[in-house]
A protein has these predicted regions:
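Serine-hydrolase catalytic machinery in alpha/beta-hydrolase-like enzymes
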Residues: 49-148
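Gly/Ala-rich beta-loop-alpha elbow adjacent to hydrolase catalytic centers
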Residues: 152-161
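Acidic catalytic loop of the alpha/beta-hydrolase fold
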Residues: 189, 211-216, 240-241
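Active-site nucleophile loop of the alpha/beta-hydrolase fold
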Residues: 90-91, 180-189, 238
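Short alpha-helix in the alpha/beta-hydrolase fold that links the catalytic acid
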Residues: 70-73, 194-195, 217-226
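Catalytic histidine neighborhood in serine/cysteine hydrolases
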Residues: 226-243
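Short beta-strand/loop motif that positions the catalytic acidic residue
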Residues: 207-209
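Post-His helix in hydrolase/transferase enzymes
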Residues: 244-258
Length: 296
């Protein structure tokens, strides 16, 4: 049974912790066999992937990867049977608004949207200082620490996940998520980010927000969710945090069960395609060998 706080909408009206070869027909049979063997090794790599989906996680403003990992302890227990989570720490130190200094080494930010180098989710029309560096940082993690299937973000991290999904839709990033979880997310008000929301995003997403959130009001999270066609909504009665109680447990389990099933089905199809490719390569090798013998 789905959680009583979980309400599903389909918006059809608007679409571990870290700091971060071609063969010639005249080729001999042995050489062709060697080439086929090399291709086989390359094509068999997906079978080595674990039977869990892997999720890259992005923390909120003034947090870091360890902080988010600790806060998601219960959530990770709920979903750990189906998913593995890797937590990144943003490359930028937070500038403390009280002093204008960057002495809060453990407090990190993905970008700043105010002229004083700080960030506020409700700010509109501001800059996006440091965003490109963070984008490159996450793209490198996605490539070097992958493969990953999904993204998860909280607060500013969820805003970032929304931007990454939009950029992926427009093929403006090397990141290609199959799904995403966005908790206390919102649309970025930075002018440089407006184009990321031009297309409706179709991957499955879970949007989580608190009805009493006074940092990112629920309306801001709802506005973000409207840009996703296959959005599942999980409301909770609390404030600005990632909920993980018995009331949300089944929603998380159901979501990750579905994503794991989709991942395994796609993996099976890919492996079947690889077998067909290898069978075709073997037949071509036999034909090339026969043609070579005839010419002798």
């Amino acid at each position: 049974m789905r959680c009583k706080f979980c309400i599903c909408y389909n918006y059809t009206d608007a679409e571990h912790t870290t700091e971060l070869s071609i063969t010639n027909a005249s080729m001999s049979t042995s050489a062709a066999s060697s080439s086929t063997s090399t291709v086989a090794k390359q094509k068999q790599q997906p079978s080595e992937i674990k039977d869990k989906v892997r999720v890259l996680c992005l923390h909120g403003y003034r947090q870091n990867g360890d902080a988010l990992k600790n806060k998601l302890g219960s959530f990770r227990k709920f979903a750990g049977k189906y998913a593995e989570f890797v937590f990144l720490t943003a490359p930028h130190q937070v500038i403390l608004p009280e002093t204008g200094s960057d002495q809060a080494a453990e407090q990190r930010s993905w970008w700043a949207n105010k002229d004083d180098g700080t960030f506020k989710g409700t700010n509109k029309g501001g800059p996006a200082f440091g965003f490109q560096e963070s984008l490159g940082f996450v793209e490198e993690a996605w490539d070097k620490q992958g493969p990953f299937q999904g993204l998860l973000g909280f607060s500013q991290g969820a805003c970032f996940v929304g931007l990454l999904c939009g950029l992926a839709k427009k093929k403006l990033t090397s990141i290609r998520p199959d799904f995403a979880i966005l908790s206390s997310g919102f649309l970025s008000g930075s002018l440089a980010h407006k184009s990321a929301y031009e297309e409706i995003i179709t991957i499955p997403t879970l949007h989580i927000y608190g009805l009493s959130d006074d940092i990112i009001p629920k309306e801001m999270s709802q506005d973000l969710a409207r840009h996703f066609k296959n959005a599942e909504i999980l409301e909770h009665p609390g404030g600005h945090y990632f909920p993980a109680t018995a009331a949300q447990k089944q929603t998380y389990i159901n979501f990750f069960q579905d994503r794991l099933q989709e991942y395994l089905e796609n993996l099976e199809l890919q492996q079947a395609s690889n077998v067909t490719f290898l069978e075709t390569a073997d037949k071509q090798t036999a034909v090339d060998s026969s043609d070579s013998n005839d010419s002798d």
